[in-house]
Amino acid sequence: MSNCVQILSDENGIQVCFDIQQEKVMAIGEEMNAIQEEAYMNGENWDIFLQYYLAEYAPEVLVGMETDPEAGMYAAYYDSTPESEAKAKKLAAVITSLLEHPEEIYRILQEAGDEIEWD
């Protein structure tokens, strides 16, 4: 798992935290912004991009998910259930895969960036 993405859990629920201020993530965000001018990659726009991506490629992860994007952090929350734990693990794996293969992000922006309703 990327050191940019962590899964935290307790009796209140499961949280997937994505630190968007890491150097690698910032570099990906800068390239995203170069491709799509409206894609200034703060927490809100990472939320918007991930919502778009997940709706297309992993819609089951969105079921029961709540998000709280901040300036330097993206967080997703699930209830504390075995099903939600599996969804959180998949979400973390999706984010990690995108970070390891940012060309997928860039491809989506080139093909559909204007369809995404950026912040």
What residue spans do the PLM features occupy?
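N-terminal, charge-rich interaction modules
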Residues: M1-M26
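Short proline/glycine- and acidic-rich turn/helix-capping motifs at secondary-structure junctions
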Residues: E104-D119
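Surface-exposed, low-hydrophobicity interaction/linker segments
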Residues: C17-V63
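Amphipathic protein-protein interaction modules
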Residues: W46-E104
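Aliphatic-rich, non-membrane protein domains
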Residues: N3, Q21, S97-E100, E104-I108
